[in-house]
């Protein structure tokens, strides 16, 4: 069975962890951006039923309200 000869350094662990987290953050940002463009009607590449646009708009409205409340504290 293969066993590593030396212990992985803390800095290398941190680099790998941050890289992994960064990928997730980028994906979440893209998803939020896509949802926002769909809700405003600026999307040119997706056809979305009207009732789901209402849901997206409600989500964006709630998100904006939460951001406003968070900035006051």
From Swiss-Prot:
GO cellular component term, pick one: large ribosomal subunit
GO MF terms held by the record: structural constituent of ribosome
Gene this protein is translated from: rpl32
InterPro entries (UniProt xref): Ribosomal_bL32, Ribosomal_bL32_plant/cyanobact, Ribosomal_zn-bd
Claim: Transferase is one of the keywords in the record: no
Top-level taxon: Eukaryota
Keywords: Chloroplast, Plastid, Ribonucleoprotein, Ribosomal protein
Protein name: Large ribosomal subunit protein bL32c
UniProt xrefs under SUPFAM superfamilies: Zn-binding ribosomal proteins
Main localization category: plastid
Subcellular location: Plastid, Chloroplast
GO biological process annotation, one example: translation
Family: Belongs to the bacterial ribosomal protein bL32 family.
Organism: Jasminum nudiflorum
């Amino acid at each position: 069975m293969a066993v590593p000869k030396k212990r992985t350094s803390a800095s290398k662990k941190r680099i790998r962890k941050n890289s992994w987290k960064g990928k997730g953050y980028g994906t979440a940002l893209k998803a939020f951006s896509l949802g926002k463009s769909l809700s405003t009607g600026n999307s040119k590449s997706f056809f979305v039923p009207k009732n789901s646009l209402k849901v997206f708009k409600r989500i964006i409205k709630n998100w904006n309200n939460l951001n406003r409340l968070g900035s006051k504290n």
